Amino acid sequence: MTGSEFGYVNDQIEFASNQLANITELKDGFDAIGFSQGGQFLRAYAQRYPHASPYPRVHNIITFGSQHMGVSDLPGCKLTDFLCRAARTAARAGVYSVWAQNNLVQAQYFRDHMRYPTYLEVSTFLADLNIESPDAKNRTYVDNFKALDAFVLVFEKDKTVVPKESL
């Protein structure tokens, strides 16, 4: 991936998939381990790309601390840290803007249940990956996901991601 903070996640996953397709040692597939948002991106690759040439198949995915159902809040600030609190308020207000959804990686998996209709309408990554919109019926994603031999999620004792139950 070219950026963990900035960029359009869908382009980054496409870029990574093309790199994987060019690694001949992976022709028989591979197992993958993802940490934090990297786990979501591995799942996106496994769901979106066919398990046929030129794309190598993912056999097993293990993710640690990955926000597969998104995050619904930003990390908190100390009560006395007014700059942090102002930045947090501004970020939360703009997370569903077109610019944020196309340029800020974390905004692309922000899933606020209090603004769920807005999330479904503007999400450029997570709502698609999770097949959440009412008219989403992407059989390819489902079939590719079912083709995994194993999908293991590990997530506990997290103090940054809200909610920590974001499996």
Q: Where do the PLM segments sit?
A:
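Soluble non-cytosolic domains of exported or imported proteins
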Residues: 7-10, 120
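Serine-dependent carboxylesterase/thioesterase catalytic core
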Residues: 10-116
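Active-site nucleophile elbow and catalytic-triad environment of alpha/beta-hydrolase enzymes
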Residues: 115-142
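Eukaryotic basic, amphipathic alpha-helical target segments in cytosolic regions
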Residues: 24, 49-50, 133, 137, ...
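Glycine-rich "HGGG/HGxG" loop immediately N-terminal to the catalytic nucleophile
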Residues: 1-7, 72
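C-terminal catalytic-base region of ester-bond hydrolases, centering on the histidine
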Residues: 140-167
